[in-house]
A protein has these predicted regions:
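Terminal targeting signals and extreme-terminal segments of soluble enzymes
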Residues: 1-285
């Protein structure tokens, strides 16, 4: 499957209103829509309305979206300038808001650019072991993506010793080299909470409260290297950021988010999000 097909929207009579039928492959093990996928669909809607590329987008998650029923996306253009548009998109299902997204879109012609951060020196995907997190043959996200551990430890290697907060995993969505898109990067970027386990030294994961993506240069690649840096865990919430690199070390973008910390074993046993204790969320479960 071409990853772009996962974010194909359906137009309606209202150019500001779109619908989307999410694939089951975009669902977490709890059978809820992965937050980055929701952000990705919202950016696709705003690009379709404005005709401009995404520079920055952020999402605030309001409720879980279980299953694959049709989702509605309503775009509002707040400001449309010569080079930049500021827009927002409300993603909902049957009248219940799932997430709200704000974005800046546009481009400018300038002959000066550069990258001042460095892609870490890690082995290529084929030389890295599979990262054992999602179960396969379950009909959800685990059947869509391949994960290869480039830096850090497997969950069963964690014995309470905390890491330095740095973690890296190669991610492949579908097979074959293809041009990266913002929706796909938003989806991959929402895997940032994978880094919390290595940092904490125990098998924890996180439900995203929010997601932010800043877009760099989009190039062709099969694998994306997600490098994460956990910044802090306090009061049951974790804060972290990440960078998205192509196989040729092109910086595709960077991400950041806050997440509700949960034990991975508890999440597996529960099977569904504990909405009685925490309503917002998406992300990795």
């Amino acid at each position: 499957m071409n990853p772009a097909e996962l974010f194909t929207l359906q137009a309606t009579d209202d150019r500001m209103h779109w619908t989307w039928q999410p694939s089951s492959l975009l669902l977490t093990p709890a059978k809820t829509l992965q937050g980055g996928a929701g952000l990705g669909a919202a950016t696709a809607a705003m690009v379709a309305v404005t005709g401009r590329p995404v520079v920055w987008a952020t999402a605030q998650y309001l409720s879980f979206a279980s299953g694959t029923a049709e989702i509605e996306l309503d775009v509002t253009v707040e400001v449309a300038g010569h080079n930049t548009t500021q827009a927002r998109c409300v993603v909902s299902r049957q009248g219940q808001e799932i997430l709200t997204t704000h974005a800046a879109l546009g481009s400018r012609s300038i002959d000066r650019d550069g990258v001042w951060c460095t892609c870490p020196d890690v082995p290529p995907p084929d030389s890295c072991p599979e990262y054992r997190f999602f179960e396969r043959r379950t009909g959800h996200i685990g059947d869509l993506i391949d994960l290869r551990l480039a830096r850090g430890r497997q969950l069963d290697e964690l014995h309470g010793t905390r890491g330095d907060g740095a973690f890296a995993v190669w991610v492949r969505v579908g097979r074959g080299v293809h041009r990266m898109t913002v929706p796909e990067l938003a989806f991959i970027g929402d895997l940032m909470p994978l880094g919390f386990a290595d940092a904490m030294g125990e098998p924890v994961a996180g439900n995203s409260l929010d997601n932010t993506i800043r877009v760099g240069r989009l190039v062709d690649t099969e694998w994306v290297l997600l490098t994460t840096q956990v910044q802090q865990v306090v009061n049951g919430f974790g804060y972290g950021r990440g960078e998205l690199w192509a196989e040729d070390a092109t910086l595709l973008g960077d991400v950041s988010q806050n997440a509700v910390m949960r034990l991975h074993t508890h999440i597996r046993a529960l099977g569904t999000p504990n909405t009685a204790s925490i309503r917002p969320g998406s992300g990795v479960r």
